[in-house]
Swiss-Prot record:
The lineage of its organism: Bacteria, Pseudomonadati, Pseudomonadota, Gammaproteobacteria, Vibrionales. This is UPF0301 protein PBPRA3139. InterPro entries: AlgH-like (IPR003774). Belongs to the UPF0301 (AlgH) family. It comes from Photobacterium profundum (strain SS9). One of its GO terms (cellular component) is cytosol. It comes from the Bacteria.
Length: 187
């Protein structure tokens, strides 16, 4: 089972504050483990303010200021000082992984001055930190019914308001959230 380009949707029984009602986009999953970004846990800073705080210098004018008002996300509890940009594939950056035709993840800083400009991917999210699982750990959590899984949908990532992403993902699975038990092992 390879869950790259899937969502992990936290079951109501999930109590870890990093993942409670969380939706994780799985960027990579293989025999060595898994890596993903929580896409619905905002922190109290906008992308634009973050860029100002880290003193990103721009050579191009900002032509999409609305994209800079979105919240930076807490991508997970691992390396919370490390940034990740999940975006539509566009441009060549020093450290990018093209996941599929709709999504890439970039960890190099060369993307930052372009955010909000005509050279940036039109749609993107910025996360600090990531969710990581060692070999077999995610599979164990799945066996314990900690997560529901579904194929990822870029519309949920880029078009759905942050606070509606969990409900939207559950609804797309055809499940009424009220019918999900908060106890593990029960429907």
């Amino acid at each position: 089972m390879n869950l790259t380009n899937h969502f992990l949707v936290a079951m109501p029984s999930m109590q870890d504050p990093h993942f409670k009602r969380g939706v994780v986009y799985v960027c990579e999953h293989n025999e060595e483990g898994a890596m993903g970004l929580v896409i619905n846990l905002p922190i109290e800073i906008s992308v634009g303010n973050m860029l100002e705080q880290i003193e990103v210098e721009r050579d191009l004018p900002v032509n999409n200021p609305d994209s800079l008002t979105q919240s930076v996300l807490n991508g997970g509890p691992v390396s919370e000082d490390r940034g990740f940009v999940l975006h539509q594939p566009k441009g060549q950056f020093d450290s990018s992984i093209c996941i599929n035709d709709e999504l890439s993840v970039t960890t190099s800083q060369d993307i930052l001055p372009l955010l909000g400009t005509s050279e940036a991917p039109e749609k993107f999210i910025v996360a600090l930190g990531y969710a990581g699982w060692s070999a077999g750990q995610l599979e164990q959590e799945l066996a314990e019914n900690s997560w529901l899984t579904m194929e990822a949908d870029a519309e949920v990532i880029f078009e759905t308001p942050i606070n509606e992403r969990w409900d939207t993902a559950v609804a797309r699975l055809g499940i009424n959230p009220a019918n999900l038990s908060i106890e593990k092992g029960h429907a």
